Each structure stands twice: as C-alpha cells, then as structure tokens.
Amino acid sequence: MTLPASPPRYAVIGNPIAHSRSPQIHAMFSAQTGRPLRYERLLAPVDGFLPTVQAFRESGGLGLNVTVPFKLEAYALAEARLSERARLAGAVNTLSWRDGAWHGCNTDGVGLVNDLLRLGVALAGARVLLVGAGGAARGVLQPLAAAGCARIHIVNRTAARAAELAAAWRAAAPRTGTQVSAGALAQAAEPGGWDVAINATASGLQDAAPDLPGGLYAPDALAYDMMYGARPTAFMRQAEADGAARCADGLGMLVGQAAESFHIWHGVRPDPGPVLLALRTELLAAG
C-alpha cells in the first residue's frame, strides 16, 4: 500500500509572527486553485534566521515568505539568485527552493501596484507622492516605475534619507522614463496636486499621520496607506480632510503580494478578490 504524499511545505518566517495572516491567505488560495499545501508560521530568534531556514529546508520546506526583521538577511541568503525586483528593492520577502539553492524575490511592490489597479487608478502617467524612505518605500519604486508613473516624489521626515533613496534608485534602476525626486515632508506639495499619495511609513502603528502640508491632492486623487485595520488609518483621515477623493488601506496590498508569492511557487495565479473580501469582512466584524 502506497502512503499518500505529504503536501508541499511552505511558511512565513519572522519575529514576531503570531499575528501573521499569511497561513489563512495561502489556505484560501490553496482551496481556490486546488493546489494542496502545508503553510505555517515560523518564529525565528532575532539572531537565528539562517539556522531556522536550514532546519525548515531539511524538513522538506520549499518556500518562505519573509517578514520583519529578516528581509535583509533573506536578501543576503539569495544574493547570487535574485530577481530584478529584489535587487532593486534591496530586500527579499519570498524565498523559493529551486535547483538546489534559495532564490529570492520581492513581491511587495507588485502587490501594491495590483491593488492600485484594482482600485481603478490609472498609473500610466501618474504623479505619485511616496511618503517614507525606508524598506517599504524602496520596495515599491521599481513596480511603480514599471507601471508607467511619470513622477515619483519621495518625502521623509529626514530629508537626507529621501535624497539617498532617490539617488540610489537613479544609480541602480534601468531607464524607465519615471522622474524620481526627493525632499522633506514640508516639500510634499505639487502644483495641481498628486494623483496618488502612498504612506510607506509605520506612523499608523501609533495612530498618527506624517506631518504633511495641506493641498496635496489632485481631483479624483487616491490616498493609500500601506498599513491596514478595521477603521481608516490616521493618514487616511488626514487625506480625506485635505480633499483626497478616495482613500484605501493596505489590506489589498497584503493579499496581492501573497498572490504573487503563490504564483512564483505554484505557477498558477489565484484571484485575490474573494480572499480580500473575506479578510475585510473579518476585520470589520472584529473591529
């Protein structure tokens, strides 16, 4: 009698990790596509990323989503086998075991772009304000440029960090036709307003908004916060008061980046819509 094969094993690794919705998301993708899998949370010691990954691989693991604080270590692990998106992002959030080695990709920016498109944003020719100059901001520059944005203006509380990110992007990125500039938060204004403003800071964790000037938004503009919750974030409330026509949080980005990881691992692209609806319903019920 032949025993049934165990489903392929995947996980999300981070510290902390108990809050992660990735197992729930990938279970729904599995049911939707008919691709069996085992997906779990891996809590790694802050100084124990590599041993945890090695033990996971030795137990048959084939893929990892990587979250805080390990995206840079994942980049180093897969440095010889990086996708272009990961190279330009400077961080890896998706590891795949292929041909005897770990390969690294970054799906955060694709998740953002796909969610913006789902929301009806015309990114081709768009003027985008990107608030924040950390890893979250860096990770979305290439997909935004590839989507045809005309201009991306990076602003940060420390203006020098925004300038460094813009300079690093211009030095490393292929020619895209996207103008990338930088400044302080107080230099966020644009004549005619921005078509899209994206908050890539963690200000929402303190229920605070970046200290931005008023008058930022063009008619029909969208304000997008990478953070999410049951209620509008402080950035969303600030944007609405400043005249943004629409506001959205980052739950769709979360589901979108997971869908891209699923596609990398399994070769099939799930529909994020039903999963996003289920998570949103759950959030609202809990909030």
Swiss-Prot record:
Keywords: Amino-acid biosynthesis, Aromatic amino acid biosynthesis, NADP, Oxidoreductase. This is Shikimate dehydrogenase (NADP(+)). GO terms for cellular component: cytosol. Belongs to the shikimate dehydrogenase family. Pfam families: SDH_C, Shikimate_DH, Shikimate_dh_N. Transmembrane segments: none annotated. It comes from Bordetella bronchiseptica (strain ATCC BAA-588 / NCTC 13252 / RB50) (Alcaligenes bronchisepticus). PANTHER family: BIFUNCTIONAL 3-DEHYDROQUINATE DEHYDRATASE_SHIKIMATE DEHYDROGENASE, CHLOROPLASTIC, SHIKIMATE DEHYDROGENASE. It catalyses: shikimate + NADP(+) = 3-dehydroshikimate + NADPH + H(+). Its EC number is 1.1.1.25. The lineage of its organism: Bacteria, Pseudomonadati, Pseudomonadota, Betaproteobacteria, Burkholderiales.
